[in-house]
Regions:
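Sequence/structural signature of beta-propeller modules
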Residues: 2-47, 325
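Gly/Pro-rich loop segments of beta-rich domains
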Residues: 33-68, 79, 95-108, 139-155, ...
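Residue-level detector of Asp-centered blade-edge/turn motifs that repeat once per structural unit
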Residues: 72-75, 114-117, 161-164, 207-210, ...
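Conserved beta-propeller blade signature
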Residues: 77-79, 119-121, 166-168, 212-214, ...
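Short loop/turn segments immediately following the C-termini of beta-strands
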Residues: 83, 125, 164, 172-173, ...
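A generic tandem-repeat structural signature
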Residues: 96-175
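Blade-level signature of beta-propeller repeat domains, shared across WD40, Kelch, NHL, RCC1
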Residues: 295-327
């Protein structure tokens, strides 16, 4: 089940530095691992292995407290919505770490996206708003929030971009996905597109290269695919713990092959589907202490084919690599 926003332990307080800038951490964070998992035996299924573990529990740079959202920029830098530390962390491929935000600027950030110009989009569940920042952390604009008169979000939890730099927000408690242009102008709402397809607390959204929109219809335990015109044309998954089944799915990502990755949060795993909904991978299949996931809430893909998983209640990020295909 989705467990919400875990509180910080009594002996730990969030980062208090309210300066809105990047702060560099000396040394390197990322540590490669060699654990192999998610081996698959079914026909045409692919397998992925754990290649790297990033971060641990805490409030220092390079540590996480309930990482909920992740994104990768064109330079393969990783961005993590470090929710209970009220910040975004940027981690370079070399392992350098930078922090953006603090409790005076961000309140429980849930989703993060980065465009081709390295502008950063953050949705804050705690403030019911979306903020846009420049590549160096400078404020650009915000939408929503407690004083907003027109834009009203209710627990926005995920955000993604399309090839036109439109951004899509999973506006969870409004049971919709809403779309804005890069300049912050409203473009379109996707809410209960048909009587048969009515969203219930959607907590993930992704757009593929063809403009099709994938919505994690979380409390209906499925993913709904919409055409570029917003018409539902496929339902992926069904409720349950089995292969290809979903329990409260959250984050979504499209990989290099056009495959759909789903953070199957309630089943403590991630799964890959083809664009048409055929399940082809599950991680982990045989959990070990190194590979076990705890309510993962987000997934992202980089330009080399690696998959990143926000292991939310494990307070870390895992990087997965392909281990090949078994027929």
């Amino acid at each position: 089940m989705v467990r919400g926003n875990p509180a910080l332990p009594p002996n730990m307080s969030p980062v208090t530095d309210s300066r809105f800038q990047y702060l560099e951490l000396g040394g390197k964070l990322r540590r490669p691992t060699v654990v192999t998992a998610a081996e698959s035996t079914a026909a045409r299924r692919v397998s992925f292995r754990l290649a790297e573990t990033i971060g641990s529990f805490g409030s220092q740079l390079g540590q996480f407290s309930a990482p909920v959202g992740i994104a990768v920029d064109p330079d393969d830098c990783l961005y993590v919505a470090d929710s209970c530390n009220h910040r975004i962390q940027k981690i370079t491929p070399e392992g350098d770490v930078y922090g953006l935000g603090g409790p005076d600027w961000l309140l429980h950030p849930q989703g993060v996206a980065v465009d081709g110009a390295r502008f950063i989009y953050v949705c804050e569940q705690g403030a019911n708003r979306v903020q846009k920042f420049g590549p160096n952390g400078q404020f650009v604009y915000r939408l929503g929030g407690p004083l907003a008169s027109q834009v009203r979000f209710a627990s926005p939890t995920a955000i993604c971009l399309d090839s036109y730099h439109h951004f899509y927000i999973a506006d969870t408690d409004n049971d919709r996905v809403t779309c804005y242009t890069a300049t912050g102008l409203w473009y379109m709402d996707y809410a209960s597109p048909t009587k048969e397809i009515a969203f219930s607390r959607p907590q993930g959204v992704a757009v593929d290269l063809e403009g099709r929109i994938y919505v994690a219809d979380t409390m209906h335990h499925r993913v709904v695919r919409l055409s570029a015109q917003g018409k539902p044309d496929a339902v992926i998954g069904r409720p349950g713990p089995g292969f290809g089944e979903l329990t409260e799915p959250c984050g979504l990502a499209i990989d290099l092959d056009g495959g759909l990755w789903v953070a199957d949060t309630g089943n403590d795993r991630v799964q890959k589907f083809t664009a048409d909904g055929e399940a082809v991978c599950c991680f982990p299949q045989a959990p070990t202490p190194e590979t076990e996931l705890h309510a993962p809430r987000a997934v992202a893909a980089d330009s080399a084919g690696s998959i990143y998983v926000a292991d939310t209640l494990g307070h870390r990020v895992l990087r997965l690599q392909s281990a090949g295909m078994e027929w």
